[in-house]
C-alpha cells in the first residue's frame, strides 16, 4: 500500500513538473512577444 501511494505521489510530481514547464514556456513566449513592442 505504501509503494502504491509512493507511485501516485511520484506521478503527481511528474505531472506538476510538466505543468510548470508548460506555464514557464508560455510566460517566456509572451515575454518575447511583448519585448519588441516596448522597444519600438
From Swiss-Prot:
Protein localization: Secreted
Top-level division of the source organism's lineage: Eukaryota
Cellular compartments per GO CC: extracellular space
Tissue specificity note: Plasma.
Primary localization: secreted
Example of a GO MF term: metal ion binding
Residues reported to bind Cu cation: 4
All residue ranges annotated as the Albumin domain in the record: 1-40
Keyword Metal-binding: yes
Keywords: Copper, Lipid-binding, Metal-binding, Secreted
Family, per entry: Belongs to the ALB/AFP/VDB family.
Additional note from the record: In the red-eared slider turtle, there are two forms of albumin, ALB-1 and ALB-2.
Task of the protein: Serum albumin, the main protein of plasma, has a good binding capacity for water, Ca(2+), Na(+), K(+), fatty acids, hormones, bilirubin and drugs. Its main function is the regulation of the colloidal osmotic pressure of blood.
Stated name of the protein: 67 kDa serum albumin
Amino acid at each position: 500500500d505504501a509503494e502504491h501511494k509512493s507511485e501516485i505521489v511520484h506521478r503527481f510530481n511528474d505531472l506538476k513538473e510538466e505543468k510548470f514547464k508548460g506555464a514557464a514556456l508560455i510566460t517566456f513566449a509572451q515575454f518575447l512577444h511583448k519585448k519588441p513592442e516596448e522597444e519600438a
